[in-house]
Amino acid sequence: MASTKEIRSKIKSVQNTRKITKAMEMVAASKMRRAQERMRNARPYAEKIREIVANLSKANPEFRPAYMEAREVKKVGTILVTTDKGLCGGLNTNVLRFITNQVRDLQEKNIEIVYTAIGSKGLQFLNRSKAKLISQTIQIGDTPHMDVLIGAIIAQLEAFERGEIDAVYLAYNRFVNAMKQEPVLEKLLPLEPAALVPEDKAGNSWDYIYEPDAESILNGLLKRYVEAMIYQAVTENMASEQSARMVSMKAASDNAKNVIGELQLEYNKTRQAAITKELSEIVGGAAAV
């Protein structure tokens, strides 16, 4: 049985660990609220671009932009969004499982995959898997900026424009609520015209005055729309990261509290046994006298 001194040392160690996890839980909760706000602020921009692109496409059906051109799929690109840091439960594992399943399904069809990694954890996974990378960006911080992401994103978009890849997918964790995040694998390119039109506005039809012309504006907006979708995915993944970390740290704090309780009980039993032994020795000594 451990001595009372050893048990006190263990209790002190677990208490210090609990202070750390409790502080990390509070920091993650604060960061999660800010990440949720950024996520909500990014949505109206993407929605408005989608609405304008849908109206332009309906008003000018003769245009067939490169981003909406479907072709036989022989090679695909996947943009993988993960976190830069750990301690967020199974968040990264869940989205990486999607990637593993995608690789298996596409390899069965002899389709090649090239990747863009956003986040250190995804980059490490792809390097271990010896996957083909065409671009990457890591250490994007708690506040994502498009100027940091754009270089990696453009590599995939330009590869699609040149016909080097035939489809682009986006893998990330969608934020549902503080307790739930779900991994998703979405098809980004080619864009489906029907997917651009919100159901509540499917019957509306608008047209605009174009300068210089409708085709160049449509091409430019489609590119901005795809970039906005990727930025939205990054903000959702960040909100998911902070909420998962908050939950993980809360679980760690609760477990530490339980361990402290068990150690305290063991300490009391050990101390009581020592006192009982001393009393027995005293009583035995007195009887001998």
From Swiss-Prot:
The record's listing under Pfam families reads: ATP-synt
Q: Name one GO cellular component term.
A: plasma membrane
Where, per UniProt, does this protein localize? Cell inner membrane
Q: Which SUPFAM superfamilies match?
A: ATP synthase (F1-ATPase), gamma subunit
Keyword check for Ribosomal protein, yes or no: no
Question: What Gene Ontology terms for biological process does this UniProt record contain?
Answer: proton motive force-driven plasma membrane ATP synthesis
Q: Which UniProt keywords apply?
A: ATP synthesis, Cell inner membrane, Cell membrane, CF(1), Hydrogen ion transport, Ion transport, Membrane, Transport
How does the protein associate with the membrane? Peripheral membrane protein
InterPro entries in the record: ATP_synth_F1_ATPase_gsu, ATP_synth_F1_gsu, ATP_synth_F1_gsu_CS
Gene3D superfamilies from the xrefs?
3.40.1380.10, ATP synthase, gamma subunit, helix hairpin domain
Q: Name one GO molecular function term.
A: proton-transporting ATP synthase activity, rotational mechanism
Describe its function: Produces ATP from ADP in the presence of a proton gradient across the membrane. The gamma chain is believed to be important in regulating ATPase activity and the flow of protons through the CF(0) complex.
> What is the annotated quaternary arrangement, including any partners?
F-type ATPases have 2 components, CF(1) - the catalytic core - and CF(0) - the membrane proton channel. CF(1) has five subunits: alpha(3), beta(3), gamma(1), delta(1), epsilon(1). CF(0) has three main subunits: a, b and c.
- Of which family is this protein a member? Belongs to the ATPase gamma chain family.
> Which named protein is this?
ATP synthase gamma chain
